[in-house]
Amino acid sequence: MTTPADDFTQPETPAITLPAFLELMNNDLQNEWTHLKFYLYHASAITGLDVAEYREFFSDAAKGEMDHVQQFLDRLYGLNYANPTQTSHSFSVFSRADDALTHAIELEMVVAENYVKRLQQLEQLAGAHPVTARYLTVFYEDQLKDSYEDAERMRRIMANDLREIMRNTRHDPTKFLAK
């Protein structure tokens, strides 16, 4: 005899496969290409009194993203993924530093959230591929740390501007806060 509680049990979520995870990882690589191009573009596009400082900031950020792209490529090739992406998503362009930084914070927080999902998916992958899953867990923890800290650094750069933006806002303030 079944009880009413039996009718409400959730079906088990099937564990993710390694090929499916590598597809998601390739999508993450595309996001990293987007960040690289965004920062490199804005190193030259920003105008204003502090242009030299922002050029240096965005150039350094682009170098960091280039490292991320290389790390994702190395992992994908190391796991025999046949054709890692060479493309990025399109991105918004800005001439004002505060607009570019605001958007960059959003970009970094989106990937940070994706990396949290990947870490959860790697828990599912661990049963079938324990060593690979553990290695990729360390990899994604490092990526999460970098993206979160990049967003945090930009929030600090913009501390006063960000408060004003959020007050008058055309931006959703929750995009700037850690979840």
Q: PLM features: residue spans?
A:
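Iron-associated oxidoreductase/ferritin-like identity signal
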Residues: 1-179
